[in-house]
C-alpha cells in the first residue's frame, strides 16, 4: 500500500490503476480505525480491483463545542490496519491540501430535509460539512463504488441522496454495523468511555432491540415505545439526545402502514455521544 498526501499524487495513482482496467473502490474515513472500518475496506476489496482509503479529520463537520482537537490521530496504526484489510492506496491530506483557500470561502454542498432533524438538529452544519468533503473526495478519486457504514445511518442517507441528485456515477454500498460481543456498535468514540461507562454502553442497542421487538409483535404506538426506550436509557445512565422510529428511506417520522423502518438514536454517556440504529422490515399481512 502506498500513502500519498496530495491531490496530484492521488490522481496520478488512481489514473494508473484505471489505465490497467481496474475498478476503483473508495472508503473515506477520519482515521483512528477499528474493525468496523476494516470491514468497509474488505467489502470494497471484494467489489473492486483497486481500493483507495482516505484519512482526513474534516474540520468542516465539527461544531464549535465538539471534539475536533481531541479526535485521535493514529496514522501508523491505521496504515497497518488498512494493509491487512486489503487497501491499495491511502490518501492522507492536510487541511491545507483539502481547503487551500480556507474553509470560510469553500463552496458548500447541502442536502436538504435529510440533513435536518436527528443528528442534524443537535449538530447544525454537520451534514453540510460531511456532504462537502465527501463530494470533494469523490471528485478527487472518481471511484466506481464507495463503501460507508450503516452505523452512521443518517450520513449514509445523505450521501445516497447527494450522489443521486448530482448524477454521480458512483455505486454507494452500505456495510452492516460491526458490534462488540455485548452488542455495542464499534466507534472511534468508544475510546472516550470510562470502564464503568463502557459496561453501561450496550444498553443503547438493547433499547433499540426492545423497541424493534415491540413493533415486530404488532405494536404501532411508536410514541409509547419510544417513551419506554427513553426510560430504559435514562435508567442505564444515558442522557438521550433523540430516540425515534423513522421511515427507513425518507427518514420522516414513521406511520403505522410503513413496512421499512429504522429505530435510530443518539445518547450521551458522560460527555461521549454514541449513535446507533436498527433497521426492520415488516412483512405485509395476508388475509
UniProtKB/Swiss-Prot annotation:
Major localization listed first in the record, in broad terms: cytoplasm
Binding of (R)-pantoate, residues: 61, 155
Q: In which pathway does it act?
A: Cofactor biosynthesis; (R)-pantothenate biosynthesis; (R)-pantothenate from (R)-pantoate and beta-alanine: step 1/1
Top EC class for this record: ligase
The catalytic activity, as recorded, is: (R)-pantoate + beta-alanine + ATP = (R)-pantothenate + AMP + diphosphate + H(+)
Q: Which CDD domains match?
A: PanC
| TM spans (from-to) | none
Q: Which residues bind ATP?
A: 30-37, 149-152, 178, 186-189
Entry similarity comment: Belongs to the pantothenate synthetase family.
State any further remark. Answer: The reaction proceeds by a bi uni uni bi ping pong mechanism.
Q: What is this protein called?
A: Pantothenate synthetase
- The gene it comes from is panC
Amino acid at each position: 500500500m502506498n500513502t500519498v498526501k496530495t491531490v496530484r499524487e492521488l490522481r496520478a495513482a488512481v489514473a494508473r490503476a484505471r489505465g490497467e482496467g481496474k475498478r476503483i473502490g473508495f472508503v473515506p474515513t477520519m482515521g483512528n480505525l477499528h474493525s468496523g472500518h476494516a470491514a468497509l475496506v474488505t467489502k470494497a476489496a471484494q467489489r473492486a480491483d483497486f481500493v483507495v482509503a482516505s484519512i482526513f479529520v474534516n474540520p468542516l463537520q465539527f461544531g464549535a463545542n465538539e471534539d475536533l482537537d481531541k479526535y485521535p490521530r493514529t496514522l501508523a496504526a491505521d496504515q497497518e490496519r488498512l494493509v491487512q484489510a486489503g487497501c491499495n492506496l491511502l490518501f492522507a491530506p492536510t487541511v491545507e491540501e483539502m481547503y487551500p483557500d480556507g474553509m470560510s470561502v469553500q463552496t458548500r454542498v447541502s442536502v436538504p430535509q435529510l440533513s435536518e432533524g436527528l443528528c442534524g438538529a443537535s449538530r447544525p452544519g454537520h451534514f453540510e460539512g460531511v456532504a462537502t468533503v465527501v463530494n470533494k473526495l469523490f471528485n478527487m478519486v472518481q471511484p466506481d463504488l464507495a463503501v460507508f457504514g450503516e452505523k452512521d445511518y443518517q450520513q449514509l442517507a445523505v450521501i445516497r441522496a447527494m450522489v443521486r441528485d448530482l448524477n454521480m456515477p458512483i455505486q454507494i454500498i452500505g456495510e452492516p454495523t460491526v458490534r462488540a460481543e455485548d452488542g455495542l456498535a464499534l466507534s472511534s468514540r468508544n475510546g472516550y468511555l470510562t470502564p464503568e461507562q463502557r459496561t453501561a454502553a450496550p444498553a443503547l442497542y438493547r433499547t433499540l432491540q426492545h423497541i424493534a421487538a415491540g413493533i415486530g409483535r404488532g405494536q404501532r404506538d411508536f410514541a409509547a415505545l419510544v417513551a419506554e426506550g427513553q426510560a430504559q436509557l435514562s435508567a442505564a445512565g444515558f442522557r438521550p439526545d433523540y430516540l425515534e422510529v423513522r421511515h427507513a428511506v425518507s427518514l420522516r417520522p414513521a406511520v403505522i402502514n410503513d413496512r421499512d423502518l429504522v429505530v435510530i438514536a443518539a445518547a450521551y454517556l458522560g460527555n461521549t455521544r454514541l449513535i446507533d440504529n436498527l433497521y426492520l422490515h415488516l412483512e405485509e399481512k395476508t388475509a
